[in-house]
Swiss-Prot record:
Keywords: Antiport, Cell inner membrane, Cell membrane, Ion transport, Membrane, Potassium, Potassium transport, Transmembrane, Transmembrane helix, Transport. GO terms for cellular component: plasma membrane. The chain crosses the membrane at residues 3-23, 30-50, 58-78, 95-115, 122-142, 172-192, 194-214, 221-241, 270-290, 293-313, 334-354, 358-378. Residues 403-485 form the RCK C-terminal domain. It catalyses: K(+)(in) + H(+)(out) = K(+)(out) + H(+)(in). One of its GO terms (molecular function) is flavin adenine dinucleotide binding. InterPro entries: Cation/H_exchanger_TM, FAD-bd_PCMH-like_sf, FAD-bd_PCMH_sub2, Na+/solute_symporter_sf, NhaP2, RCK_C, RCK_C_sf, Transptr-assoc_dom. This is K(+)/H(+) antiporter NhaP2.
Amino acid sequence: MDAITINSLFLIGAVLVGASILLSSLSSRLGIPILVIFLAIGMLAGTDGIGGIAFDNYPVAYLVSNLALAVILLDGGMRTRASSFRVALWPALSLATVGVLITAGLTGLAAAWLFDLDIIQGLLIGAIIGSTDAAAVFSLLGGKGLNERVSATLEIESGSNDPMAVFLTITLISMISAGESSLSWMFLVHLIQQFGLGIIIGLGGGSLLLLLINRIELPSGLYPLLAVSGGILVFSLTTAMNGSGILAVYLCGLMLGNRPIRNRAGILQTFDGLAWLSQIGMFLVLGLLLNPSELLPIAIPALILSLWMILFARPLSVFIGLLPFPSFNLRERIFISWVGLRGAVPVILAVFPMMAGIPHANLFFNVAFFVVLVSLLLQGTSLSFAARKTKLVVPPALAPVARIGLDIDKNNQWEQFIYQLSSDKWCIGAALRDLKMPQETRIAALFRGKDLLHPNGNTRLKEGDILCVIGQEHHLPALGKLFSQSPSIQLDERFFGDFILDADAKLDDISQIYGLNLEQGVDKQQTLGQFVLYLFGGEPVIGDQIEWDGLTWTIAEMESDRVSRVGVKIVTDKA
């Protein structure tokens, strides 16, 4: 490869990445997932597109895609709160195992019939497209304002269901290569190995990496690089030992994100850029790999297979997988059934048969790609609509305009929160001395227009003022009520109810004020929060609703795992 060729590759790569970034704004305008934009640019640059770039190097595509997935999952793990596991761990694991098996089996049987393949070959197609994709889920769920039970279940499922899909794919390829038609007992051993090594190395490697980051003194710009290189090491080491590298790197990120860590803000900021670059690079390469003209001959059976999986196999697997978990209501089950997003992982798995050289490998690849396109276009574009129709969107937490990490003490993560005051905030016109600021928070600066003011207790706030407040993450709810702008998501203003009650209020007092008909045997001295937990059962989340005694009770706020405020809405006139 000479210097001119290398320079040409740099030029082409820069143009494609730059075009992807500039055209990403079309995603919100056209209402299509941003990943489809990246994929389309890759396809346009490919053999059948205007670019005419001939790219069929499957090993390189496999390398780029796995590296990108490792970075995306490391970032996703860091941003996943450990508290999410309280409500979603076991349901997500059920979907990641039982759900994938059912989806792969039903889809595989349909594929064998539609494409005139034998059962093992059909099941291989089912295994390839049987798991949801973490990159697609993390990208498309972000900012949708879903309740925690649903969003956490989908995210944890997408980060943990790849071991089953990878294992099924490799096992079925081995069976086809060896001419076998039945499974041996080693099937279970290999499955345990995939999950076991992924969990052990992921948690262990994450702990060691966390210890190293907190112990070693480095320039601040090197901590994010140490974190990402450590995550890739965990991914590659686990994969080399025949474990699930995808699960391992996700758990590694989870460890880093939920423990005190040096330069957290810098690491997260760098990871955000790396995750975007990884998504762009991965879908550009996959788009280059595809020849759209090869999809036309299989379009009708592949479309039928996609609809079969989306409308039947996935919903059935979700309803069966969530049977042991009564806390999920029907609306939540329907939405989770719909958001079985496919993305890069099925295409990466479809590369395995190509590299193994088994019969019909090109068919498997094209079918997987077609299913991914249908999933992103059909499910991805309708995700917001489905969330609204199933009433799973909750008012977003009031957030500052920007957050800047202050790397002062890894055990006390101080940040600077920036708020711009809108006209609907009650604090407009109030003197600073009258603000009930949370303990241990301080207003560090006040900007009015382009001027930096020197505020004192008599300074009165005006619309458009920009406040810089020093505090910690747990101060955000209280600060949000004081300073945040109104959320942009359109919701019923009375989502939580006609009025909101303190969950520490005694049930007896509330029943007398509102005329509640308490059942015999109910402890009237318990708090409203305790009574609501009794009504809901399981692990509640913000936005959970239940009708009781002619009223709709909605969990409005939670502190850790404790209900702190409850909304009440009148449903019917009580006699």
